[in-house]
Amino acid sequence: MTAIIRQFLKLEAAGGLLLIITAIIALIMANSPLQGIYQQFLNISVAVQFAALEINKPLLLWINDGLMAVFFLIVGLEVKRELLEGSLAGRDKALFPVIAAIGGMVAPALIYLLFNGNDEFTRQGWAIPAATDIAFALGVMALLSKRVPTELKVFLLALAIIDDLGVIVIIALFYTKTVSLVALGLSAAMIALLVWMNWRGVEKTSAYLAVGAILWVCILKSGVHATLAGVIVGFLIPLRGQNGHSPSELLEHGLHPWVAYLILPLFAFANAGVALNGVTLNGLTDILPLGIAVALFLGKPLGIFLFSYISIQIGFAKLPQQINLKQIFAVSVLCGIGFTMSIFISGLAFEGVDESFSVYSRLGILMGSTIAAFMGYGLLRMVLPKKK
């Protein structure tokens, strides 16, 4: 294991705990007399202007669309390294998280529809449990970081990022009312420029980040989730330079402390404050929250593990070294933490309908994600190697 990865795991252990603490603080504030202060903080207007271009958004969206793009940049860098040189190198190993992610989207959606398919309003939320909150899933795993094999963490990263990309496509196809073709065209041009820079051997990460910032603006204006820009830039920054140094690893090393100690805890604080006003005991067993919760803590592991197991048995994919099927199952349960991505889809699915749909969908997401987090953590403790 490289020194950078060792440092990353150490950072995550502390950062994961900080993430959970800030999430709890946010949940308390959102359901207490401090709710007003919490909402005022998230709704602070932040404007950035460059010539004729102006982006004016509340702080919450700057955190979710802007700062989280940096997190996804690091995820892209790490997954690329493992695909080229690490535990996912080779077609059969690289296919493994792809197949797992497909199962992790299909099964929860089907289970949700078993509960809600007959209701014309609630069935619009079929994609809610398809999402995995990569930040919170990593945060829980980070609590056991010294025992987690690098290969298992990379599997979670790869699976979750493919899952998120799939959800972004779902949002674009089924939940985006207006898409700017001009902005999409400019996004494609920026991606082409990044590909050309990589092909020409440009090694300066500052050049990639500059083009990446423009790409981020273009994707934001297109109506597609802007964090996609971070993944794209991460995959296109060169892994190895001409003199043997690694531009991508140097960038990872510089950004990791900021992500672990600032960006992810701030993200948790901004998004975990789910207000539960108007919730009743009878509503807890309604088909909407129940369908979401069951789809997350049961559908996710069912889909991920079954698709993974079958792909291995038929020889279509190969289990990465140093990890076993018990650990894969534990991680698949952890992927049931849908949380912020699920809440985002919920807002799109039930936009313009009665507020109770939004309240009870958030409740279902909170229940399912919490159960998945505790179950996933408990299973990981059981199946991971003991400390030496």
UniProtKB/Swiss-Prot annotation:
> Highest taxon of the source?
Bacteria
Instruction: Name the keywords, alphabetized.
Output: Antiport, Cell inner membrane, Cell membrane, Ion transport, Membrane, Sodium, Sodium transport, Transmembrane, Transmembrane helix, Transport
Annotated membrane topology: Multi-pass membrane protein
Encoding gene (name): nhaA
Kindly indicate whether the keyword Transit peptide belongs to this entry.
no
Q: Which GO terms describe its molecular function?
A: sodium:proton antiporter activity
Places the protein is found: Cell inner membrane
Pfam families xref list: Na_H_antiport_1
What is this protein's name?
Answer: Na(+)/H(+) antiporter NhaA
Functionally, this protein is described as follows: Na(+)/H(+) antiporter that extrudes sodium in exchange for external protons.
Family that this chain belongs to: Belongs to the NhaA Na(+)/H(+) (TC 2.A.33) antiporter family.
- UniProt cross-references to InterPro entries, sorted A to Z: Na/H_antiporter_dom_sf (IPR023171), NhaA (IPR004670)
- Would the keyword Phosphoprotein be found if you checked this record's keyword annotation? no
Membrane-crossing residues? 8-28, 33-53, 59-79, 95-115, 125-145, 154-174, 179-199, 217-237, 259-279, 287-307, 328-348, 363-383
Q: Give the range the annotation lists for the signal sequence.
A: none
| Catalyses which reaction(s) | Na(+)(in) + 2 H(+)(out) = Na(+)(out) + 2 H(+)(in)
Q: Which GO terms describe its cellular component?
A: plasma membrane
Gene Ontology biological-process annotations: regulation of pH
